[in-house]
A protein has these predicted regions:
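N-terminal hydrophobic targeting signals that begin at the initiator methionine
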Residues: 1-2
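Bacterial N-terminal signal peptides
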Residues: 5-15
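A structural "domain/chain start" motif
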Residues: 13-72, 85, 113-116, 160, ...
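A short small-residue
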Residues: 33-35, 148-157
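Surface-exposed short loop/turn segments
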Residues: 77-138, 153, 157-162
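Acidic carboxylate motifs that coordinate Ca2+ or other divalent cations, activating on Asp/Glu
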Residues: 138-145, 149
Length: 183
């Protein structure tokens, strides 16, 4: 019986124990630069918010070393193309009870040594917010995590600003996932 458990553990270790998403990135790319996004919208501070969100995702994942453009193996450039905001849900009285805030960003991931784009695409993220003024008690799942108000410890702050953070986080996660899995 001990031999069966030992062999099972060995099989597990050698089958999936050493899997790494970093193996799907071209092997010569070890670092990435993420300069400030261009902003083609009237939203003040959005370029900084999205750039910081993407930097946070890459630093947390630790897949590529984040560095400056002069020493990077790859560069992730982006342009905020559009911000839209409109009614998302309505009450029984047919008045707007929730708004949807959406951001569209065009991204290019460039390989410096090969002088070519590795990934191009448009990414969108959205967040929802109500009109109550307090997202901690508005009865809305503002960040789409399945938790509402008192159940959700990260729902606080000004509603529209929180919706922006949710949209930025979604965009950053999607970009990182595509970079890690496209190859």
């Amino acid at each position: 019986m001990k031999n069966i458990i030992f062999i099972s553990n060995l099989m597990f270790l050698f089958s999936c124990g050493f899997y790494s998403m970093a193996g799907s990135i071209p092997p010569h790319i070890k670092s990435i630069a993420i300069p400030l996004m261009d902003n083609q919208t009237a939203e003040f501070g959005l370029a900084e918010d999205i750039t910081d969100g993407i930097l946070d995702e890459f630093n947390e994942a630790g897949i590529l070393r984040v560095t400056d453009e002069n020493s990077a193996h790859s560069i992730l450039r982006g342009t905020i193309k559009k911000v839209s905001e409109g009614p998302y849900t309505y009450s029984k009285q047919e008045s707007v009870s929730e708004y949807r805030y959406k951001i569209d960003v065009k991204i290019d991931w460039y390989d410096v040594s090969q002088e070519k784009n590795l990934l191009e695409g448009t990414y969108s993220g959205f967040g929802a917010y109500g009109l109550s003024g307090d997202i901690g008690s508005d009865g809305i799942d503002n960040d789409n995590d399945g938790k509402i108000d008192a159940e959700d410890d990260d729902e606080f702050g000004e509603p529209r600003a929180f919706a922006t953070r949710v949209a930025v986080r979604k965009i950053a996660e999607d970009i990182l996932n595509d970079i890690m899995t496209t190859w």
